[in-house]
Amino acid sequence: MISVCIATHNGAHYIKEQIESILCQLGTNDEIIISDDGSNDKTIDILLAFNDKRIIIYSFKQPKKSKHSHTYVCKNFENALKHAKGDYIFLADQDDWWMPNKVEKCLEDLKKHTLVVHQAEICNEDLKPKELLMYRDKFVFKNYLSLKVGKYYGCTLAFRRELMKYIFPFPDRLVLHDQWIGCMA
């Protein structure tokens, strides 16, 4: 079973295309876990319109105020991850669009590795590539390098469930959930 974890907050602009690009790669028993941080746009309406039992939405209440706005994003992702039931966990940001073979390719590598990091393209709103995210090693950086360099993004991570026992709970002042997960691998 695959769990795709997405933290949302007012993500209506891209969420429909994103979910379409993910659903077509999932099986009937897989799931998309949405943790929504109080969206007041059409994000939830768009998600509900799919009428797909694989999309499961959880509400997320912000923790006490933090001077680090990224703390909210990290805690929102933590909420999504805590609800994931899959053997394989994928992270997605609310504005991602997945290439057609992403899941298949990641699953091949996850047979041999606990965590994989893949290449990604940063695109403009018309999906025209602006920048290619290249990694020297397509799996995971060594922990000391991850802390020093920290150049991978959650949308490029997939990992096996066994990693979950090492990542929870997220530290209270965590700023980069993706770096944390990579370092715990």
Language model region names:
Residues 36-45, 62:
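A conserved acidic beta->alpha catalytic loop
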Residues 16, 41-49, 101:
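Acidic helix N-cap motif at the loop->helix transition within catalytic regions
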Residues 11-24:
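Short, well-formed alpha-helical segments that are part of the catalytic scaffolds
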Residues 89:
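Short aromatic/hydrophobic "clamp" motif used to bind/position activated sugar donors
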Residues 97, 101-130:
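Conserved donor NDP-sugar-binding/catalytic core segment of glycosyltransferases
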Residues 62-84:
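Glycine-rich, basic loop-to-helix element that forms the pyrophosphate-binding segment
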Residues 1-3, 21, 31, 180:
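Cell-envelope/extracellular polymer assembly enzymes that use nucleotide-activated donors
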Residues 143-185:
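Conserved nucleotide-sugar donor-binding catalytic segment
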